[in-house]
Amino acid sequence: MSQARPERADAVRNRRAILAATEELLATHRPRDISIEQVAQAAGVGKGTVFHRFGSRTGLMTALMIERAQALTEAVTSGPPPLGPGAPDRERLLAFLDAVIEVVGRNKSLLAELAFSGAAEPAATGQGAAAGDRTAKDGHKHDHPVYRFWHGHISTLIAAQRPDVDAEMIAHVLLGALHSEPILACLAADGPARPAAAVRALARAILDAPG
């Protein structure tokens, strides 16, 4: 079986520089106000390099969101409980929902931009594969690899506790609520505590409802 070629050092440097420049611009600009030209200038690379690497501005924002969510992915797959393996499914679900709300709270504007633009799925799975930074043209929020991972994990944990319910749809409902304007406004004004408590209450009610 052939192994994937390692990235060239200059390609790795360019990718890091582009993502770092985007992070810096996001500190003072809304995502939709950031252009590829601005990113290229801040990163010290040509505009064509950004397009070649990420395909579009949406592709760039998607790749950055994957980077920001990677720590949560690693915590779920190989970290300590309750996020990681080893804890009961119920505890893992509640811990994961708390963690998702924290990530959403720290990335409100970026997530809103990706939802607004209908961010498409990169060829990468969100596990750090650099070759998949480019995006397809047409997609939906649920095609985003971060969303797919979150949804799959939530639905799996719910199904393990309640095989009699539609775990996939419930996971969509829980995640969809976190992208709604009232919840994003609450996160911006007051932080994650109130939405987190509400989502935990909903999850407990679902798990404890009579069969």
Where does each model-flagged region fall?
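Basic, helix-initiating cap at the start of DNA-binding domains
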Residues: 1-42, 59-62
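Amphipathic alpha-helical interaction segments
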Residues: 17, 59, 91-95, 99, ...
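Short hydrophobic/aromatic patch on the recognition helix
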Residues: 44-54
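Hydrophobic alpha-helical connector segments
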Residues: 63, 77-106, 127, 131, ...
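Short, basic, alpha-helical segments at the C-terminal edge of helix-turn-helix-like DNA-binding modules
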Residues: 66-73
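Short, hydrophobic secondary-structure boundary micro-motifs
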Residues: 73, 109-115, 186-187
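Amphipathic alpha-helical packing segments from all-alpha helical-bundle domains
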Residues: 73, 103, 121-163, 167-172, ...
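Amphipathic C-terminal alpha-helical segment
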Residues: 103-106, 156, 160-163, 172-192, ...
